[in-house]
Amino acid sequence: MRYMGGKVRIAKYLVPVLQERLKDKDTFVDLFCGSCNIISAIKAPNRIANDLHKELIALHKAVQSGWVPPSVVTEEDYKQAKQAEDHLKAFIGFGCSFSGKYFGGYARGEGDRNYALNAKNTLLKKHQNMKDVEFFNLNYSEVNIPSNSLVYCDIPYKDTTKYSTDSFDHSSFYSWCKDMKARGLDILVLCSLVRKDTNIVIFMKLLAWRCFVFLVQSMQNLM
């Protein structure tokens, strides 16, 4: 399923790093799970996925419970989808939109490309590996994080297009990270830009699509 902000192209770099850090952990927590490209590839005794996007979490829960998305979505279906139930609204809003931007315009492909079918197949395949994932629709600070967890945070980037209408307070988030780190939690943050006054160790990979990815591996001395 096409999804703005999805990490499908860099998952092969991120997952091994996360998996290595999970060796002595009981739980993997994805606080901003989005389309679940990362958590679906993670192996852990317990997995928690959270996102503030209500319809998106409704979609994941519906598929996990056996709902099968439609194989065909017409332009008229797309126009009516904002009044649909949350799970169908999310499927059409993300999976059938241009570049995966939530209701960013009906996607039209060349030839016989079927965006709905592609999104359906991708989502169902992904959920084959997520039968035991616990899904939540909460603010990141409200999630009950078990001790001995690895917490992965793919936060909204500054000055980029968001898939949610809510603004994101980066300063508050980093303060929360500092508090969680003090409690002994292992927190990794994926971000495009790192503040100059932040003392961190980063994992950096230059991708073929000419973008630097920074994986924060230590949240010490933040702010």
Locate each region found by the language model.
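Mobile active-site "lid"/loop adjacent to the S-adenosyl-L-methionine
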Residues: 104-112, 159-171
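Short, polar loop motifs at secondary-structure junctions
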Residues: 32-37, 120-123, 191-196
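Glycine-rich phosphate-binding loop signature in dinucleotide/nucleotide-binding domains
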Residues: 21-24, 144-148
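Short, conserved active-site loop motifs that form the nucleotide-linked donor/cofactor pocket
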Residues: 133, 149, 209
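Class I S-adenosyl-L-methionine-dependent methyltransferase module
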Residues: 45-137, 141
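Long, positively charged, glycine-interspersed low-complexity recognition regions
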Residues: 166-223
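S-adenosyl-L-methionine
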Residues: 1-33, 37-38
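Conserved proline-anchored active-site loop of SAM-dependent methyltransferases
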Residues: 14, 28-42, 49-54, 95-98, ...
